[in-house]
UniProtKB/Swiss-Prot annotation:
It is found in: Nucleus, Nucleolus. The lineage of its organism: Eukaryota, Fungi, Dikarya, Ascomycota, Saccharomycotina. GO terms for biological process: rRNA processing. Residues 1-33, 110-135 are annotated as: Disordered. This is rRNA-processing protein CGR1. One of its GO terms (cellular component) is nucleolus. Keywords: Coiled coil, Nucleus, Ribosome biogenesis, rRNA processing. Residues 60-118 form a coiled coil.
Length: 135
């Protein structure tokens, strides 16, 4: 993209179009000696009007976009964690209820075989051992 690419034909300086147009004295003659050739600009020089995408978006806009993206991701993560914790809580409650039910059934089976007082003593002993083990 040269500096003259986005101009109308009439607006383009003659040095870019007409090879016979008078040269500026400051330019001097060409190194290769081909003075009859048309003057051309460098193909891609950023100072001549090629604007990259990063220059179009200002830093503040990119920063705002990045912050919004971070907030969105944080909120999404928070919702996922909340959902996961609710699921884990339900599972833990279900396990606890099943354990209590299984223990109750076990004591009932023991009660059919043994005397009631002996079952009560065993229950207390197991509870004591469980508390000691958890310490």
């Amino acid at each position: 993209m040269s500096s003259s690419s986005n101009l109308q034909y009439e607006e383009i300086p003659k040095k870019y179009i007409d090879p016979l147009a008078p040269k500026d004295k400051g330019e001097g003659s060409r190194v290769n000696g081909k003075d009859w050739k048309i003057k051309k600009d460098a193909f891609r020089v950023k100072t001549l009007g090629v604007v990259s995408k990063t220059k179009k978006d200002s830093f503040k806009q990119r920063e705002l976009k990045r912050l919004e993206e971070e907030q969105y991701k944080a909120r999404l993560k928070e919702l996922k964690d909340e959902k996961e914790s609710a699921k884990n809580q339900r599972i833990a409650d279900l396990k606890r209820r099943r354990e209590i039910k299984a223990e109750k059934e076990r004591y009932e089976r023991m009660a059919t075989k043994m005397h009631a007082k002996k079952v009560e003593r065993m229950r207390k002993r197991e509870k004591r051992n469980k508390l000691l083990k958890e310490r």
